[in-house]
Amino acid sequence: MFLFVGERFWGRASGVTYTDLSLIDCEFNSCGVERDTGDPRNHIERISVMGAAQLNCSIADALIRDVTIQDLRKLGSAPLFLWGCLFERVTLSGRISAIKINQTVGLPNAPADRQRVHNSGAIEFYSSSDWALDISQAEFPGGVTFDAIPGDKVRRDPDRQVIVSRAGLARSDWRAIDFDGTAIDYALSWFEQEGLFDSVVLAERSDRKWAKRDHAVLRRLCDAGIGLA
């Protein structure tokens, strides 16, 4: 295990493998892990990150396995973007300021079939995975999306993070619920129309402006039999 404390990282790479690292109070500035045509999938495994900060960073088309991230803050306005990644035994805890997990591979010059191959691969990958992500001890002040991960593979705090099934949406008039401007209805609409999996996890924001409203909406979903605490 290689230890880095207070280091600053920048730059971009494709088709890389990062393993057996411990990073404490490090800063990542405009870092990008990409996958150019012809390069293998990126691998990020057995890594511990504590107290990191990121500015305009992204990870695309990576297998992220046995990784823990505790407290992640953003230095600019952009979240950490994750494009077309697969997760296995990844734990987020503490304050995770902004992270966007996208189902799309997000590569403008990727071959036309890249998304199709990713989608079928993701379904197969998660069908044999025990669990993908643990967010039970995490707070998300800026919000987070988990559309790219099947809800039943996410370990969560049922008081702040609920699971919604595709079947639950289908048998309900969920659009009639008062979403109070939270945009949770947009997340559900995207899941219903574009999601790969049968369930998704919704997490309330911890920011003071949104926490109570998000919590109330998630309770309404549960009371209506759409969400499961």
Predicted regions and their residues:
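Tandem repeat scaffolds
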Residues: 1-175
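Long, ordered, amphipathic alpha-helical scaffolds
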Residues: 159-229
